[in-house]
């Protein structure tokens, strides 16, 4: 099986100074693994969601000065792109790997989906494990662990999605660098697979909006 677990070298890519130097190493070391992860998990996510899912590896093409602080592969039910659609991500920062279900700022269904999340809040907390984390900004590494959030904090996150133009909502897991380095390839893939099985619930909720 192709080696898809990230290594020390992969994490260290995001400490390299300069856009060109970092991108050169990213293309050589990280991107092939993201591509392999995309090919590996697209069929899994298609089966979990009932939608044919297509992988999109981040190209960072618009960058001209600042090097990327993270990189990822996203999965959405369109070959053309993912940013406007409910999607999943696997990626890494210098410090950790992330596995997300995501609705980001370009999504046109944010308001309706936020209302649906608010109505189904109790069901969501029962379906999403307490060890999972929530984020309101995909460009920042900071997160809120579900076990440390009260009902009002989660409700605020859902309300924000309805009312703030640039609002985002992400839910998933973070695997710290040391934890990933201590896994073998199969253990790494299994953790991602397990997370997607839990996160598919949030995707299926979006289908109530998109297929209405």
From Swiss-Prot:
It comes from the Bacteria. SUPFAM superfamilies: YktB/PF0168-like (SSF142913). It holds the Pfam family DUF1054. Signal peptide: none annotated. Belongs to the UPF0637 family. This is UPF0637 protein YktB. It comes from Bacillus subtilis (strain 168).
């Amino acid at each position: 099986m192709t080696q898809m677990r990230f290594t020390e070298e992969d994490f260290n890519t995001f400490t390299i100074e300069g856009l060109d130097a970092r991108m050169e190493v990213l293309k050589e070391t990280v991107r092939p693994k993201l591509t392999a992860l995309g090919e590996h998990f697209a069929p899994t996510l298609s089966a979990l969601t009932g939608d044919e899912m297509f992988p999109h590896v981040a190209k960072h093409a618009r960058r001209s000065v600042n090097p990327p602080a993270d990189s990822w592969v996203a999965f959405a039910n369109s070959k053309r792109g993912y940013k406007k659609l409910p999607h999943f991500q696997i990626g890494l920062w210098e410090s950790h790997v992330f596995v997300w279900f995501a609705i980001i700022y370009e999504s046109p269904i944010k308001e309706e989906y936020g209302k649906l999340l608010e109505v189904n809040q109790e069901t969501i907390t029962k379906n999403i494990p307490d060890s999972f984390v929530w984020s309101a900004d995909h460009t920042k590494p900071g997160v809120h662990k579900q076990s440390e959030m009260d009902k009002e904090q989660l409700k605020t996150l859902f309300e924000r999605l309805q009312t703030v133009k640039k609002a985002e909502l992400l839910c998933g897991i973070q695997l710290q660098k040391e934890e990933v380095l201590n896994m073998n390839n199969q253990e790494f893939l299994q953790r991602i697979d397990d997370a997607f099985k839990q996160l598919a619930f949030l995707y299926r909720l979006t289908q109530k909006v998109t297929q209405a």
